C-alpha cells in the first residue's frame, strides 16, 4: 500500500491530537483518584457516554450487525433488550453504587468496592471478582479472535 500525502497528514494530525489530549489530561491529574475516576467530577452525560462506549464496543460494532445479517431484522430485539437493560441498570444500580463506593473507603474499582462492602479483611471477595473479570476478559478476547479468523475457519478448527 502506497502512502499518500493526505493519509500521512491525517495520521500526523491524529497523533498530535492524541498527544495533546494526553498532555492536557496529565496536567489535570493530581493523584490516582483523578486518573481512574476523573476526580469524581465528571458529569452524568460524560459518565454515561464513557460507560456506554466501553460496554457496547464489541457487540454493537461486530455482534449486532452480524446477528442481523445472519438471522434478519428479527434480531433487532437484541438492541432493544440491551438498551432497556442499560437503562434499568442506570436507574437501579448506578446511583447507589456511586454512594457506596465513596462510603467504602473511596473504592475505585469493583473489586475494591466488594472488599470494603463486605468488610473482607482477607480480600477474598476482591480476589474472586478479579478472577471472574480476568476469565471474562480472556473469553472476550478469544471470541474476538474467532470473529477475526472467520467463521468457517473457526468452526472447522476450534469448535469441533
From Swiss-Prot:
Subcellular location: Cell inner membrane
Catalytic activity: L-proline(in) + Na(+)(in) = L-proline(out) + Na(+)(out)
Pfam families: SSF
Gene Ontology terms, MF aspect: L-proline transmembrane transporter activity; proline:sodium symporter activity
InterPro entries: Na/Glc_symporter_sf, Na/solute_symporter, Sodium:Solute_Symporter
A single GO BP: proline transport
Keyword field contains Ubl conjugation: no
Segments passing through the bilayer: 6-26, 68-88
Induction: Expression may be regulated by the Nac regulatory protein and the nitrogen regulation (Ntr) system.
UniProt key word Transmembrane helix: yes
UniProt KW keywords: Amino-acid transport, Cell inner membrane, Cell membrane, Ion transport, Membrane, Sodium, Sodium transport, Symport, Transmembrane, Transmembrane helix, Transport
Gene3D superfamilies noted in UniProt: Sodium/glucose cotransporter
Membrane topology: Multi-pass membrane protein
Principal subcellular localization: membrane
GO CC field: plasma membrane
Superkingdom per UniProt: Bacteria
Family, as annotated: Belongs to the sodium:solute symporter (SSF) (TC 2.A.21) family.
Known role: Catalyzes the sodium-dependent uptake of extracellular L-proline.
Protein name: Sodium/proline symporter
Amino acid at each position: 500500500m502506497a502512502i499518500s500525502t493526505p493519509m500521512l497528514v491525517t495520521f500526523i494530525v491524529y497523533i498530535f491530537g492524541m498527544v495533546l489530549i494526553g498532555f492536557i489530561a496529565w496536567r489535570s491529574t493530581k493523584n490516582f483518584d483523578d486518573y481512574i475516576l476523573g476526580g469524581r467530577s465528571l458529569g452524568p452525560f460524560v459518565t454515561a457516554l464513557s460507560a456506554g462506549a466501553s460496554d457496547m464496543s464489541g457487540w454493537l460494532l461486530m455482534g449486532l450487525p452480524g446477528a442481523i445479517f445472519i438471522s434478519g431484522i428479527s434480531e433487532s430485539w437484541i438492541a432493544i433488550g440491551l438498551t432497556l437493560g442499560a437503562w434499568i441498570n442506570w436507574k437501579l444500580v448506578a446511583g447507589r453504587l456511586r454512594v457506596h463506593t465513596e462510603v467504602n473507603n473511596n473504592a475505585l474499582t469493583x473489586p475494591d468496592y466488594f472488599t470494603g462492602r463486605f468488610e473482607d479483611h482477607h480480600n477474598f471477595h476482591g480476589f474472586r471478582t478479579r478472577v471472574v473479570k480476568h476469565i471474562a476478559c480472556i473469553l472476550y478476547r478469544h471470541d474476538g479472535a474467532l470473529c477475526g479468523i472467520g467463521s468457517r475457519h473457526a468452526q472447522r478448527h476450534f469448535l469441533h
